[in-house]
Curated annotation (Swiss-Prot):
Annotated pathway: Cell wall biogenesis; peptidoglycan biosynthesis
Protein name: UDP-N-acetylglucosamine 1-carboxyvinyltransferase
EC number: 2.5.1.7
CDD domains the UniProt entry points to: UdpNAET (cd01555)
Enzyme class label: transferase
Length: 458
């Protein structure tokens, strides 16, 4: 296995380029399966989740050509050769469940997908997916290893109202509605930028699809789609991540391709605690405008609110901001466990089951912590950390970059590879001191100060 040793290095300075959005690229690859024509995607990020989705599409009959230097990928699926997703894709991420919507139009006789995985940040149940698909004429059954869906009478358009604006359920229903007979109106949809990117892709390919400001998507089923050439939008989570790393280190980093319109709630919160930024046509420069001051309430929400994926790295900023701040996580019920790692480094954090904000969320009666108070500013100390999920991983790297007392040992760095293109190289280019090592599991029981590390990065 690979681990990272990250040293406190002082200020980060320089420039990095934001890659294409993970949460758009993976979904557009699945959407390409709606068409039997060639689809070209540009600005494709070279990350683990995209590679995995490419292999998933290939297993179903897709022909894929991916030039990683130019970031251009061509995918062509003239016919679906397999309607049972191989079990090797079980529990690795949440992409396979979207194949129900994408494939049923071309394979109404039935599709089988294995159980889904992804970050360990809560139950993330599939009820919204299944209930919506059933309203389109889909019959669904399940066993311990996966889900079987079929549409024996074909997909039929319908009026669907989602109980919650779930991103995944919105995507699945859009994909299914493309091949459904008649009109489908989906209410209370998620309207994240990646959803709109999916809509643009489908419209270019020939779909009759529109959106409205009242969280409505309207689709007339058109059957098969044509060829399409589409450039993936930049990753707003990666852009914010490097912006936060710059601010917490006291440095100055220009994040090329960062888009202000994708970052509005993040930039507002960043400025409120003392972070600075300068917006230009080609990107955003991030820096620390004044000593960081807390006393804020950070509440995650669906778009256009503060994204849950920004919350974890932002907690590191709050640990270095003078005063007490509140985090209220309303999107995923189990996304604050990473704070134990920051506590181990010296951060002062308290977890609460109550909703610590002006409004109660859907987890108000849940028996689990989904709010936290962070008291800053406190020095952080190098520690041995195990990454629990992708965004917590970047938070741990940020914390290690400002920690005192040597290098932090960080396990499960493969989770960072899922969502950040060349994260080690990009951080090194800004002055970060990071080494990647191969290590046997039993060696990790040794104190980080006495580890016999074998460098695999040279």
């Amino acid at each position: 296995m690979q681990i990272a040793q990250v040293f406190g290095c002082g200020r980060l300075n320089g420039e990095v380029k934001v890659s294409g959005a993970k949460n758009a690229a993976t979904k557009l690859l699945v959407a390409s399966l709606l068409s039997d024509q060639k689809c070209t995607l540009r600005n494709v990020p070279d990350i683990g989740d995209v590679s995995l989705t490419v292999e998933l599409c290939k297993s179903l009959g897709a022909h894929v050509s991916w030039d990683k230097e130019t970031e251009v990928l061509e995918i062509y699926t003239p016919e679906i050769q397999c309607t049972r997703v191989p079990p090797t894709f079980s529990n690795v991420n949440r992409i396979p469940i979207l194949l129900l919507g994408a494939l049923l139009g071309r394979c109404p006789e039935g599709v089988y997908v294995p159980t889904v995985g992804g970050d360990a940040i809560g139950e993330r149940t599939l009820n919204f997916h299944f209930e919506g698909l059933k309203q389109l004429g889909v019959q669904i059954s399940s066993d311990s290893s996966g889900y079987y869906a079929k549409a024996p009478r074909g997909l039929k358009g319908n009026y669907i109202h989602l109980p919650y604006p779930s991103v995944g359920a919105t995507e699945n229903l859009i994909l299914a509605a493309i091949h459904a007979k008649g009109r489908t109106v989906i209410k209370n949809v998620a309207l994240e930028a990646e959803i709109l990117d999916l809509v643009l892709f489908l419209q270019k390919a020939g779909a009759d699809i529109t959106t409205d400001n009242d969280r409505t998507i309207d689709i007339f089923g058109t059957g098969g789609l044509g060829s399409v050439d589409h450039t993936i939008l930049p990753d707003k989570i990666e852009a914010a991540s490097f912006g936060m790393a710059a601010v917490v280190s006291g440095g100055r980093v220009f994040v090329r391709n960062a888009k202000q319109e994708l970052l509005i709630p993040f930039l507002k919160m960043l400025r409120s605690i003392g972070g600075g930024f300068l917006v230009s046509e080609s990107g955003i420069e991030f820096f620390q405008e004044r000593p960081l001051v807390g006393g804020v309430v950070l509440e995650t929400d669906v778009h256009p609110g503060f994204l849950t994926d920004w919350q974890q790295p932002f907690a590191v900023l709050l640990s270095q901001a003078q005063g007490s701040s509140v985090i209220h996580e309303t999107v995923h019920e189990n996304r604050l466990g990473y704070l134990h790692g920051l506590q181990h480094m010296g951060a002062e954090c308290q977890l609460f089951h109550q909703c610590l904000s002006t409004k109660a969320c859907r987890y108000a009666i849940g028996n689990f912590p989904h709010s936290a108070v962070i008291h800053g500013a406190t020095p952080l100390w190098a520690s041995h950390l195990v990454i629990p999920d992708l965004r917590a991983g970047f938070a741990y790297v940020m914390a290690a970059l400002i920690a005192e007392g040597g290098g932090s040992i960080i396990e499960n760095t493969h989770l960072l590879d899922r969502g950040y293109t060349n994260w080690v190289g990009k951080l090194r280019s800004l002055g970060a001191k990071i080494q990647i090592f191969d290590m046997e599991q039993e060696e990790l029981t040794t104190s980080p100060k006495s580890l016999a590390l074998r460098d695999a990065s040279l």
